[in-house]
A protein has these predicted regions:
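Glycine-rich, compositionally biased intrinsically disordered regions
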Residues: 34-51
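Bacterial Sec-dependent N-terminal signal peptides
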Residues: 1-25, 205
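Short N-terminal segments immediately surrounding and downstream of signal-peptide cleavage
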Residues: 22-39
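General structural signal for secondary-structure boundaries
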Residues: 23-26, 42, 71-74, 169-172
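A short, solvent-exposed beta-edge/loop patch
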Residues: 142-204, 210
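Aromatic-patch recognition
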Residues: 47-168
Length: 210
């Protein structure tokens, strides 16, 4: 069964780390564009009639007055409110809260795993190249993509602590914790089933460090 997808070429903000994958057949977080309220760094609040989250770099996509899909500059954004959840700017991506304690908590941003995608292209010549290369231009067209041409996704988790976002990973987290919290986190890390990409594990860490 064929599906119509938007072909988008745009500059990708580099991200680090290696995470467990999931699969999607869409380039956006939502199946359709929908209303959102956007809060900007200049203090303005903008009501956007048609908005979405672009999974290539977890950024804001919106339809302008001419009916053209556009990508917003993430550096100008603070928060995006959809009807079901809010996204907050974390470095170069927009991330949603998984769990919170007051104003702190655990946040997640899903992005397309370009390394895995490009490797799949090399291994399977039947897959259509979506041309997700780096460029400063947005190029839109439609493609017929089959069921087998799904895109790999990886989650990036962050802890919000004292107003700052910290990547949820051992080397980033342990160095900022005091001795007792490091001991507790290391104890949790040694338990069977612990993973830095498992939300249940990260929620337990959140309760230790926050």
């Amino acid at each position: 069964m064929k599906r119509s997808l938007i072909l988008i070429t745009i500059c990708l903000s580099a991200v680090l780390g290696s995470f467990a994958q999931e699969i999607t057949a869409s380039l956006t977080a939502y199946p359709d564009f929908r209303p959102a309220t956007v809060y900007m760094t200049n203090g303005k609040k903008v009501n956007v009639a048609l908005a979405n989250i672009f999974l290539k770099n977890s950024s804001l996509l919106y339809i302008n007055s001419k009916g053209t899909p556009m990508e917003a500059d993430t550096k100008t954004l603070l928060r995006i409110d959809f009807s079901d959840r809010s996204y907050f700017r974390v470095d170069s991506v927009m991330a949603y809260p998984v769990d919170t304690i007051g104003t702190s908590g655990l946040f997640c941003a899903w992005v397309i795993d370009l390394v895995a995608y490009n490797q799949t292209l090399k291994n399977n010549t039947n897959i259509t190249n979506l041309d997700l290369s780096s460029t400063n231009m947005l190029n839109y067209s439609t493609l017929d993509v089959s069921e087998q041409e799904n895109l790999p996704l990886i989650p990036y988790y962050y802890f919000k602590m004292d107003g700052k976002f910290i990547l949820a990973h051992e080397r980033h987290l342990l160095r900022i914790l005091d001795k007792e919290k490091r001991r507790q986190v290391k104890g949790l890390m040694s338990q069977p089933g612990f993973s830095w990409t498992d939300e249940a594990s990260l929620k337990k860490i959140m309760k230790i460090i926050l």
